[in-house]
Amino acid sequence: MIMNILNVEKIFTDAVNPNIGRAVTIKRVNEEWNGKEFITNDVTGILEGCETYTDYVNDGSISFYLKVDGNTYDVTYRDFYFV
């Protein structure tokens, strides 16, 4: 029996790396409560790279990061798209 293991980290980097140098928008990067409602901000900039992090100590979860205009953003639970 042949088992194909889904390598999520490879899929992420293979999808993102060809887009380095292009514009990317990350939705709802910052969420703040102003007392009445949540304020959300999107970030648009030039993609400089991507990283993944696997938490081997606790639950083995994987986090995904994009470097945009010199800042690194956690996009694990964020939508992003290339413009």
Indicate where each model-derived feature is located:
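Short hydrophobic/aromatic patches at helix-to-coil boundaries
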Residues: D79-V83
